[in-house]
């Protein structure tokens, strides 16, 4: 993994998926981030937090209290909302609602943007114009687990 910790930006759907299920790749990712591995830093955006809370209040208000207890345990670094002028550069490249997610991940110097949103992120995923890899939760697990085991073995 090298000297610098990997920075992993989580889209809202990854955090929501974990709240709704005890299984799957989102669970593994958030569990890894919550144990405080020194070579893995979790990030999300202020925009994502607003989106999560809005969705929970609207669709699953009973889970909001669980989220408020659970979220601080993740120790994610929160990337502030990007300024409007920074967002403009990305109009037309991705769905408007996802621009703040992509820009927040870039501003947070993420190595990975983990999202379950295949519909909107799939078309930009293969482009090399972004300084990060856009991956699904299982793609992230497949790429990172061997590195984690290697890092832990060396300790």
Q: Residues of each region from the PLM?
A:
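Intrinsically disordered, low-complexity and often Lys/Arg-enriched segments
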Residues: 1-6, 154-155
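Short, hydrophobic/glycine-enriched beta-strand segments
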Residues: 7-16
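PIN/NYN-family metal-dependent endoribonuclease catalytic core
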Residues: 9-10, 22, 26-57
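Alpha-helix capping/helix-boundary segments
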Residues: 14-15, 48, 101, 119-120
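Domain-scale selection of a single, long terminal region
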Residues: 46, 50-85, 101
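Active-site neighborhoods of divalent-metal-dependent phosphate/nucleic-acid chemistry enzymes
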Residues: 77-116
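Acidic, PIN/NYN-like endoribonuclease modules and their adjacent C-terminal/linker elements
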Residues: 119-155
């Amino acid at each position: 993994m090298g000297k610098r910790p990997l920075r992993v930006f989580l889209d809202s759907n990854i955090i929501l998926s974990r709240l709704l299920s005890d299984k799957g790749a989102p669970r593994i990712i958030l569990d890894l981030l919550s144990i405080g591995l020194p070579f893995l830093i979790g990030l999300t955006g202020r925009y994502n937090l607003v989106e999560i809370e809005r969705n929970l209040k609207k669709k699953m208000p009973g889970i909001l209290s669980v989220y408020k207890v659970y979220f601080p345990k993740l120790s994610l670094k929160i990337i502030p909302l990007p300024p409007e002028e920074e967002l403009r550069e990305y109009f037309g490249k991705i769905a408007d609602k996802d621009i703040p997610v992509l820009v927040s991940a870039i501003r947070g110097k993420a190595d990975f943007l983990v999202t379950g949103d295949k519909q909107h992120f799939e078309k930009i995923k293969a482009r090399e114009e972004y300084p990060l890899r856009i991956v699904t939760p299982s793609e992230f697990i497949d790429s990172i687990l061997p590195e984690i085991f290697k890092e832990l073995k060396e300790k």
